[in-house]
Every structure is written in C-alpha cells, then in structure tokens.
Design a protein with these regions (language model features):
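Active-site metal-binding loops of divalent metal-dependent hydrolases
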Residues: 1, 27, 96-98, 122-123, ...
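N-terminal, active-site-proximal structural segment of metallo-dependent hydrolase catalytic domains
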Residues: 1-35, 222-225
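Active-site environment of divalent metal-dependent phosphoester hydrolases
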Residues: 2-6, 29-33, 101-103, 125-131, ...
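Short, basic/hydrophobic alpha-helical segments
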Residues: 8-16, 84-87, 103-117
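Metal-dependent phosphoesterases centered on the DNase I-like endonuclease/exonuclease/phosphatase
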Residues: 21, 103-193
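Conserved beta strand-loop-helix elements of the APE1-like EEP
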Residues: 21-24, 54-71, 88, 92, ...
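Structured beta-strand-rich core segments of catalytic domains in phosphoester-bond hydrolases
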Residues: 21-91, 95-99
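Surface polyanion/phosphate-binding segment centered on an Asp-His-Pro turn
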Residues: 205-225
Length: 225
C-alpha cells in the first residue's frame, strides 16, 4: 500500500509478489493504466465510470488477480477518491487513505459500517502522536470493533518480517521500530477481524527507491467456522 512513480519499478515489484489483491494509494488517474501486470483494476465509485476525469486526481485503487472481485460503492462526497471497497464470495477488503485530522468522525462511521474482513492503507496515524484524531479510527476499530493490527500480531507471534534495502529478508523483533513512511513514522496499517489467521506479514523497504512508503505484504487465510 503506497504512493508510487511509474517507471517500471512498480510493475517489477508486483510481478515478484504475485499478490491476489494490491491496494495502492495516491494513484494519479492518468497513470493507473500503466500498471500492466494486473488487468482487473477497481477504482472508487464515480471515478471508474467517468472517462474525462481530471488527470490530477489521486485515487485509492485495488488491483485484483482475477475478476471475481467486485466493487462496493461508498458514499462520501468529499472523499470518494480515497476509499475503495471490494469483495468476492469469501472476502471483503476496504482500502483507504485518510486525510490528516479532517472530518474524521464522519469518515469513521463509513469505515465502521463497511464491516470488512480487512481494512488497510495509509491512516496518517502514528502511535507517537496518538492525540491526533486519526488515531481515533485505529483505536475504535481495535478496541470497539474487535479488529487486530496484523503487524503487531505478527510481532507477537513471530510472523513479522522486513526486507531491507539490499533485499535481505529478516525477522522483525518485538520492541523495535519499523517505519512504513519516508518521514520515519509508521502510518500504514492492516487491520483484520478475529477470524483472519495470519501466516506472515512483511514490510518491504525496497519500495522507498520509487515511492515514499514501504509496501506491506500480508499472507493470511480465513478460519473455517
């Protein structure tokens, strides 16, 4: 989940992981088609259907390996471009890019009502600054709605890893700090419901070569009830 520049690096990175779903934030609408390794792309409602969209608008976009994934409309006039909700027969995912401290209460209600298996993206929230409004979203989803922070879960269960700038994969250690943003903060999160079983989670720092965020890669499955 990250903002990026189209120069071939992103396509090579996506080919390496072959993820079932990729959520990208701040994708300039005019450049989205240059992501060539995924053919099923889902943009926020209103934007996918408009041909003459302003080329400067940045979108949160879902790239899906197959066309079983469908878009679910989200209704928020000012911030439709920042959210994308997708689902198939087994999963539901909510990708977001929260504005910093702006209209958080109304946005929180939309996120809560989504009731998705996974909520992920750039929350613009960091534990060191838990007094800002954006942290309220994470706090509510974890403490009131029963979601778990998969990175913290991975650290506790020894399932968290990071890939350094040389491409070496190493186990992440609980108590250490791992940034997800060039500004030396951890502002990107993957939150999941209790029935999501984490296999592993990775912060890949190599993406800082072509974006200002580290990618977060999650391997998980849904427990059978």
């Amino acid at each position: 989940m990250f903002r990026y520049l189209i120069d071939g690096s992103l396509n090579e990175f996506l080919k390496e992981y072959q993820a079932d779903v990729v959520i990208l934030q701040e994708v300039r609408s005019s450049l989205a088609d240059e992501v060539t390794c995924y053919t099923h792309k889902i943009s926020p409602n209103l934007y996918q259907e408009i041909e003459n969209i302003k080329k400067t608008i940045y979108l949160t976009v879902a790239l899906c390996k197959d066309d079983t994934w469908q878009k679910v409309n989200i209704d928020h006039f000012h911030y439709n471009n920042r959210f994308v909700k997708i689902k198939n027969d087994d999963w539901s995912i909510f990708g977001l890019h929260l504005p910093l401290q702006d209209d958080i209460d109304s946005l929180l209600s939309i996120i809560q009502e989504s009731d998705c298996d996974i909520i992920c993206g750039d929350f613009n929230a960091h534990r060191k600054y838990s007094q800002i409004k954006n942290w309220k979203v994470i706090d509510n989803l974890i403490n009131d709605k029963g979601y778990s922070d998969l990175w913290e879960k991975g650290l506790k269960e020894e399932k968290a890893y990071y890939i350094d700038y040389k491409g070496e994969k190493k186990k992440a250690q609980q108590g250490n700090f791992y940034r997800t943003f060039v500004g030396n903060t951890h502002i990107d999160y993957v939150l999941a419901k209790a029935d999501i079983h984490l296999i592993d989670i990775v912060i890949d720092m190599r993406t800082l070569a072509f974006t200002d965020h580290c990618a977060m890669i999650v391997n998980c499955k849904k427990d059978k009830s």
